Amino acid sequence: MNEHHSNNRKIDPLKSFLLDDNTPNDKNRVEIGPTLLARREWETAGLELPDLQAMRKFRWKRLTKHILDREYGGLLMFDPLNIRYATDSTNMQLWNTHNPFRAVLLCADGYMVIWDYKNSPFLSEFNPLVKEQRSGADLFYFDRGDKIGDAADVFANEVRLLISEHGNGNNRLAVDKIMLHGLRSLEALDFKLMDGEEVTEKSRSIKGIDEIKAMRCASYACEKAIYEMEQVTRSEVCNENLSENDIWSILHAENIKRGGEWIETRLLTSGPRTNPWFQECGPRIVQNNEIIAFDTDLVGAYGICVDISRTWWIGDQSPRPDMIYAMRHAHEHIMKNMEMLKPGVHMSDLTKNAHKLDEKYQVGKYSCLMHGCLLYTSPSPRDLRKS
């Protein structure tokens, strides 16, 4: 029962041991990744794949440097996206967001330990930067019941021993998101808890070469998924039997086909449901000569979030003049603001010099001028009042 198939894997001797992204050429491997469909599309597009071994090491170095710069003993992570960044390993990502059973401790000397599901320690063994696999970080009531305090004490003591050995006994510990009992148990051991999200966000603020390659690949895969969704939409709407949910399901399927993982939101609406924005995708049947608007918000290949917003006019007639003007005004807004984006530009300069929307669009405008994925920076509402 303890002998995992991963320990007995065989690789085709006629093929290279490694794929172009420097991961094992093993169809039965534990490590997830992009599909053959995605790889073929990237090759046709002339995209260069990331070196995942190098990307993982870059991220590990970034996190370790930020720990040392702040004179912390270590960084304790529970957020599954931070764990993905630190280890590139996954385990029931969405379930983990509301049942935090995984944790990673990165010590000041670079020693990294993961607490995972007890029966699946092998899920991160492909990454040599993860030195130990343990279990016991599931500090939520559904798992532990009234014994949760005892489990938290055991976990906190393990952290203490690791910091003693690999963090020089420094009790300044950065933590991102932790359950209440875990917090109390760490504080009872005299840990001074610091803001772990500040560490992880600033670590991610600078991308390495291979991360940029991964982002390009993921973005291209998302664009191909959008293309497939558009083709079906344009061919089927005239039959008046295609719902918003039907259209949205195509993006889900095409994302998964390329090795993507999930979609964060349900932002696809049609006709009168497009305004006000933020209504969620529903059963409404899309009619001929209507607008469809969506925001991908998907976690795609390599775990990269790709957030693309689009609107389509679907029909055999022309849109109304006011819709054409709104689209042209929106396009001008995007292009003018894009021109300002360059290295060294301060956030305050972006808001001060931003393209101004017409007065009639002020009430329904988006909540921020521009944003990234997972590194969310929004200018103040005062600065945005007329942008």
Where does each model-flagged region fall?
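Active-site neighborhoods and metal-handling regions in enzymes and metal-associated proteins
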Residues: 1-378, 382
